Amino acid sequence: MWIGVISLFPEMFRAITDYGVTGRAVKNGLLSIECWNPRDFTYDRHRTVDDRPYGGGPGMLMMVQPLREAIHAAKTAAGEGAKVIYLSPQGRKLNQQGVCELATNEKLILICGRYEGIDERVIQTEIDEEWSIGDYVLSGGEIPAMTMIDSVSRFIPGVLGHQASAEEDSFADGLLDCPHYTRPEVLDGMEVPPVLLSGNHAEINRWRMKQSLGRTWLRRPELLENLALTDEQRILLTEFQREHLTEATN
């Protein structure tokens, strides 16, 4: 997968290219990330990249000319078929379904805004989609872009040691993940659930699904509203709810 990034702070993306899962993906040639800095497309000695908005008001906007030239340079490098995304609070909120959709693209260009944003006409003429990572304000689009790169790259074949890791993540099937345990078997008096030590994989999978359904019901019940649960899942959820109620009243 190839990802182009337009950012005034390309150095920030070393966190993605040099470390962790994404760093290994880059090293192994599974993921390629290239950055363009709009400052490199300025023609004044101050390398100006911001300008005042028409109509007044606080703050500045990213200057059109260097931003557009950076976008065009990225598009040229990408060739045909690259989807251009602007990370914006006004965009579609990123969730696991959206990540899966984005992961089907071979090429993405991510535009990281700064200041008060970018000229609306640039959005209309250069941007294919706007995406947001949540209803809160950040100083720029770099962290949202890194979030998107990290989540999307997990679906590139070969990036994870076990592809099942991506398939079993929280939200992969619309549910939160189940609890996980490792050694020691007893920690401060708290024991690992016996079923996980049983070696019975059918029972382990059943327990994990029940915990996943129950955790979603407790923490993110709205997620269940959009899911078509199987008969088995309904039974497991009812079991969890009954057990939870019993524990709460004891």
Swiss-Prot record:
CDD domains linked to this entry: TrmD-like
The UniProt record lists the keyword Cytoplasm: yes
Keyword terms: Cytoplasm, Methyltransferase, S-adenosyl-L-methionine, Transferase, tRNA processing
EC class of the enzyme, as a word: transferase
UniProt key word tRNA processing: yes
GO biological process: tRNA N1-guanine methylation
Domain of life of the native organism: Bacteria
Catalytic reaction annotation: guanosine(37) in tRNA + S-adenosyl-L-methionine = N(1)-methylguanosine(37) in tRNA + S-adenosyl-L-homocysteine + H(+)
Annotated S-adenosyl-L-methionine binding sites: 113, 133-138
Location of the protein in the cell: Cytoplasm
GO cellular component: cytosol
Subunit comment: Homodimer.
Protein family per UniProt: Belongs to the RNA methyltransferase TrmD family.
Protein name per its UniProtKB record: tRNA (guanine-N(1)-)-methyltransferase
Source organism: Photorhabdus laumondii subsp. laumondii (strain DSM 15139 / CIP 105565 / TT01)
Top-level taxonomy: Bacteria, Pseudomonadati, Pseudomonadota, Gammaproteobacteria, Enterobacterales
